[in-house]
Amino acid sequence: IHAAYVRLDARWEQLSFVGGLRYERTKTDGEAFRFDVDTNRGVLQNVDRSYGELLPSLHFRYELTPDSILRWSYSTGLSRPHYPDTVPRLVISDEDREAEAGNPDLKATYSHNLDVSWERYLRPLGLISVAAFHKRLQDPIFIGTSTIGSGVESLRITRPENGDSGEITGLELAWQQTFDQLPAPFDGLGVYANYTWADSEADLPFGIGKTELPGTSRHNVNFAVFYEKHGLNTRLAYNSRSAFIQEFDAADRGLDVYWDRRELLDFTASYQFTSQWTAFAEINNLTDTKQRRYQGVRNRVLELEQFGRAWQLGLRFEY
């Protein structure tokens, strides 16, 4: 990847501006064996691709008051496909009559992004913010499953494909506050809360309809309580996200694959007892949450994962 950019900064009293233009040139080379059904042999196939994109951006910041800021921005972005997904590969499982394939024609996803936000800084140390965003996507990437053949000779192939376009519209609310005004020892307490609502829609490949964007939950919640004082730092954090689509089925949308709603509770703590030594502890997934993947409807379970709690204790030395 080669890139070059220009940037302009300007300020007029309470209004400041940052603008830029970035050019990125991407080149990929790869090779893999492709199975040839006519010769019943593997054939070495080379894939060479290159493309360039212009990525403009505009960012405005206006100080309504010393403690209140309004922001507006337009930007563009490029999300490249995972390199293994672009390799011309085909891995077949004879037992399940299923296969995974790469897609050498997979395109990068280009996005146009609009964001507007209002921030209010709280005393002694805190923040309230409200933000809205809208993104338009070109060539979003999906993981799709299709079936070739019929009966016992059929084969279900899963591979990445590009859709035509998509969009996401959302709202984000955030609040962070430390309570320095409380009497000791409670003056080290603080909270952080964040909620994001996102509505997404995209055209599926092959013109078979529309769906939500893969990996995009409609609801995301984060909440944390923390304590920071005299070298002691502790944090109890809760995260929740609603169900989201992972894969679509080209023949039967009732077989689309989803990850179910998930909730996690994590705890971290550290204590710096000298300028160089810090003891720390981390416990992830305190509630031993299970993760469920289902097909079409929630009671058609494909996979149930339970990894348990993860513990980590240690000492950190800095010099």
What are these regions (language model features)?
Residues I1-D67, V91:
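Signature of Gram-negative outer-membrane beta-barrel scaffolds
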Residues I1-H2, R49, L78-S129, F133-L137, ...:
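Outer-membrane beta-barrel signature, preferentially recognizing the C-terminal barrel domain
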Residues E13-Q14, T65-D67, P124-L125, D180-L189, ...:
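Short loop/turn motifs that connect adjacent beta-strands in outer-membrane beta-barrel proteins
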Residues S240-D249, S270-Y319:
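C-terminal beta-signal and adjacent terminal beta-strands/loops
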